[in-house]
Design a protein with these regions (language model features):
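Ribosome-associated RNA-binding proteins
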Residues: 1-169
Length: 169
C-alpha cells in the first residue's frame, strides 16, 4: 500500500508539465450535443525527483490543460532514486492495470511506453525498464505507476525499519 507523504509546495520546485492524453467528451442533451475536453497532465522536477499528476476538464483544450496542471501541482510526491534509476524492482497496481518497474544499468535509457514514460521522465529517472500489464487506459496506468513509485524504498529506509546501520546491510 502507498505510504502517506507530507504535502510538497509546488512553488519551491521548477516544475515542467507534460500532457499525457486529451480526450474529447460529448454529452447528448435535449438541444443537441455538448462538447468538452478532458486532459491528463503530469508535472515534475527531474532534478528534485518530484512528480505529480492531475486531470482537468473544460470546454476548451487550453483551459483543460491548465486545470490539469493546477490539479497535478496539488498532488506532488517525492521519489526515492538510486543515482539515475529505481532502487529495486516493484509492481504497482490500480484497477485492472499493473506496472512493473525494474532498475537498469547506466546508459539503458527509459524503456517505457506512453503514460509511464511521461511519469519517469518528469520524475528524473534516466535508466529504467518498465512493463505495463493489463489495461492500457492512461488514467489507470498512471495511478499504477504512482502506486509503484510510492513503494520504492532506499537503503536508509530499509536500515531504519530493521533497526540497523546502513553499512550493516
Amino acid at each position: 500500500m502507498a505510504r502517506v507523504t507530507k504535502k510538497l509546495d509546488a512553488a519551491s520546485f521548477q516544475l515542467k508539465d507534460q500532457v499525457v492524453s486529451i480526450n474529447r467528451v460529448t454529452k447528448v442533451v435535449k438541444g443537441g450535443k455538448n462538447m468538452s475536453f478532458a486532459a491528463l497532465v503530469v508535472v515534475g522536477d527531474p532534478s528534485a525527483a518530484v512528480v505529480g499528476f492531475g486531470s482537468g476538464k473544460a470546454k476548451e483544450v487550453p483551459q483543460a490543460i491548465r486545470k490539469g496542471i493546477e490539479s497535478s501541482k496539488k498532488n506532488l510526491m517525492r521519489i526515492n532514486l538510486t543515482q539515475t534509476t529505481v532502487p529495486h524492482t516493484v509492481l504497482g497496481r490500480f484497477g485492472s492495470g499493473m506496472v512493473l518497474l525494474k532498475p537498469a544499468p547506466e546508459g539503458t535509457g527509459v524503456i517505457a511506453g506512453g503514460a509511464v514514460r511521461a511519469v519517469m521522465t518528469s520524475a528524473g529517472v534516466q535508466n529504467v525498464l518498465t512493463k505495463s500489464i493489463g489495461t492500457n487506459n492512461p488514467h489507470n496506468v498512471i495511478k499504477a505507476t504512482f502506486d509503484a513509485l510510492a513503494q520504492l524504498r532506499d537503503r536508509a529506509d530499509v536500515a531504519a525499519a530493521r533497526g540497523k546501520q546502513v553499512e550493516d546491510l
